[in-house]
Amino acid sequence: ESDAKATSGGWFWHSGETIKSAERLFQMYLETVGRNATLILNCPPDQYGVLPAHTVTELAKLGKLLHNRLAWPVEGLNEPATDLAKVATIEVSDTRTGGKYEVGNLTDGDKETYWGTNDGDLDATITLTWNTPQVIRYLVMQEPIKLGQRIKDFMIEYSEDGATWTELCPDMQTTTVGYKRIIPLNGSTSNSYGNGYNARKLRITILDSRACPLLSNLNVY
């Protein structure tokens, strides 16, 4: 759980206080929700019990950023960001036998279904391929957390030509996934929506796990 202030004046309302910009709030979202935490964002009402207009404005802008970048459904807006994982061909190095653990579970939007490897297989690769290069900025992964946090180390690479690979965000710690991990592929939470990368392929290599790795959700934006 991450408790945070949206405003400058403290936990309660203070006259003349300002609110953090929508971009700063989005950064906070990436650094909390995107790192396997619950964000409790304090937005204090004024002395009349009303949220100040500047607070409402920035929160509405934050909603648009989440909608346009991470496909949060916001009523009244146009179509959200396209989940590029849903239009990719996905190949995996190993699929668990004896059950319904197929790769399609990664993109079905159901937290109760998941892809996994066989017992004893603690590493794996997941490769997404597109017919034409796609501009990618974020990777979202979720483990079926009721079965434990398993993944200990992973690496992300992309290929623009489909043959040569370049590691993404090499300086970012990629040691856990947990309930939800949102990774800005340029490695920056403060400027995550930069130019993006033209990718024909995206590869996630799980290097080590506490037990056979499992993933319930995989999204690319």
Model-derived regions, located:
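Carbohydrate-binding surfaces of carbohydrate-active enzymes
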Residues: S2-T95
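Generic recognition of flexible, low-complexity loop/linker segments
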Residues: Q27-Y29, I126-L128, Q142-E143, R203
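Short, solvent-exposed loop/edge-beta patches enriched in aromatic
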Residues: V33-R35, T132-V135
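Short strand-loop junctions, especially beta-strand C-caps/beta-turns
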Residues: P44-D46, Q142-P144, L207
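Disordered, acidic Ser/Thr/Pro-rich linker "stalks" and the adjacent N-terminal cap
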Residues: L62, L66-P133, P144-R150, P170-V177, ...
